Amino acid sequence: LSGEFGLNGLDVANPAGGDLFVSLHANAHPRRNRDGVETYFLNVAADRYAARLAERENGLDLGEGDEQAARILTDLDAKASALSSRRLASLVQQEVTAGVRARVGDVRDLGVKSALFYVLLGARMPAVLVETGFISNREEERRLASARYQDEVASGIARAVTQFSRSAARVAAAR
């Protein structure tokens, strides 16, 4: 959405009450031999600025008497969101790399990382950013342009989302 319409995808996902958010990207690096897939999640629990942003985004009123309670609730919400996002990121990374290896060819697994990406800030649902390969690497650029690779990345993400949703449904049913 962002490139085509000038929007952050969360401008659509948050008001629509989305259950999760996946942002797809092609990576780049000055060293043209860099390759691989990596998945990021936002971990705001330790970031004061992000915690204040979450307070604002979640509409918490930080009145004098309730300020500490609101901060505790915001911190708990941020930690729960980071845990869910990390779990989703792990599933996406695992399914995308395994699927590409099985159906397209070898791929470097660069792992799951947390970072302060603008596109993930303010998500009111588990949110991840997937770097599907390095467009600065000629071989990966060709791979990224191939329908076969794109289909397998999409299929891997779909498998991860299905697993994540089933797991969330089991947790909700157990409550």
PLM regions and their residue ranges:
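Active-site-proximal helix/loop segments of hydrolytic enzymes
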Residues: 1-175
